[in-house]
Amino acid sequence: MKRLLSLLLLLSAMQSVAAVPAAADVPAAANNVPAAGRADAILAGVSDGFRALGAYGVSFEVRSDEYVTRGRYAVEGENYYLVLGDAEVYCDGAVRYEVDNRRREVTIDVVDTGSRNILNNPVHAFDFLGSEYAASLAGEQEGRAVVRLTPAPGNTSSAGNIVLTVDTAAMRPVSLRYDYDGEQVQVSVLGIKPLETPLKALSLI
């Protein structure tokens, strides 16, 4: 979460936007009984949908406190290219290169393959089955389901607790909310489509 927040705050300092209230969670079903089986089925539907696309692109909006930033990423296999504000991230599946175009700096880091943080490892941002998260259905109503994901004991994930809202008709994610030590980051998914062009390659020349 620290990496996600530091990147957000860096970008937000460059281009702050007037705050807009975060999207509310979908109201829970009347009985509000956790249903792990249904939650797992929804998670499977979402991850299967992304796998069926093969290479794909996602556009999104991030909200943290009074800041709002839009971004996008493209995935092909374990490789991805992500843009958020003036920053770009290139990843070859093993190493990620964070490029701050304004400061003309490049930070090189090893990929955290176990991360489910959309800004840290977008390849697996919606791949929760078999991960170190316990899933429960927080509510389902009018074609929207809310799945709560809690780190299992021993999971030191940087994403903390996660709330995933899903359009159950299309089995597509609508939003993610990360909650780590009281800090919240809301990510709204604006669009998902098959990738039409090759991933942008890193050039340091």
Please state what every model-predicted region is.
Residues 70-119, 185:
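An acidic-aromatic
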Residues 140-205:
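Gly/Pro-enriched, hydrophobic low-complexity segments
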Residues 70-72, 86-88, 134, 161-165, ...:
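Short, surface-exposed charged micro-motifs
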Residues 2, 15-68, 74, 78-79, ...:
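N-terminal leader/targeting segments and the immediate start of mature chains
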Residues 4-12:
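Sec-dependent N-terminal signal peptides
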Residues 111-142:
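Flexible, surface-exposed loop/linker segments and immediately adjacent secondary-structure boundaries
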Residues 62-64, 84-85, 99-102, 177-180:
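Beta-turn initiation residues at beta-strand->coil junctions
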